Amino acid sequence: TIAHSGRGICRNAGSNIPWELMPDLYQYTIDRDSTTLWSVDQSKFRPDLTVIYLGANDFSGWMMPDNKKFNKGYLSLLSEIKANYGEEHPILCMTPGPYEFLFLYVRDVVNNCGMKNVYFLGHCPMIHNETNEDLGAGWHPNYNGQLKIAHALIPYIATITGWGLQDVLVK
């Protein structure tokens, strides 16, 4: 898991200064330490799938990022993942939050990236409530919000990977 609050594809939350963006931080073993780059050759772990759930920070503060810059950053991240795990490795690109343009931006990147096994899942704004019921610190989904996202995501992952669905309660 690579996660960092406030980071975006081409613009961080509340800032137009493009520093420490997620495509840059992707290869870091230790957060914000560029001297500790991760290497696929040194790791025995190979994920079955990569899920990208980015973009809300790029649209934060009701600022809309430049489409070309966003596409370039997103393609850079997709290319890094494919370079690490190969063309056959599946990547599911999801859109967080109620941003219609983010949906369009990510869908455009996925549809035009020219890479195999890159999928798009754009969910509606009401995947979780925009209230304390489903959100925690910094407008990030809390346990309840993440559970709702997981329930929407599970069928897509099962289809992409060929995994069967099990009749069990997801907690």
Give residue spans per PLM region.
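Surface-exposed acidic, glycine-flexible loop patches that form ligand/cofactor-binding
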Residues: S34-F45, I81-G86, I160-Q166
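Conserved, well-ordered alpha-helix/loop/beta-strand core segments that scaffold catalytic motifs
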Residues: V51-Y53, L78-E80, N84, I91-C93, ...
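Conserved SGNH/GDSL esterase-like catalytic core that processes O-acyl groups on lipids
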Residues: T1-K68, G97-F103, G136, H140
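Loop/turn elements at helix/coil->beta-strand transitions in domains of secreted/extracellular proteins
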Residues: F45-T50, G86-I91, G114-Y119, I160
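Generic structural signal for well-ordered alpha-helices
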Residues: Y74-I81, V106-R107
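Catalytic His-Asp segment of secreted/periplasmic serine-dependent ester chemistry enzymes
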Residues: A13-L21, P96-K171
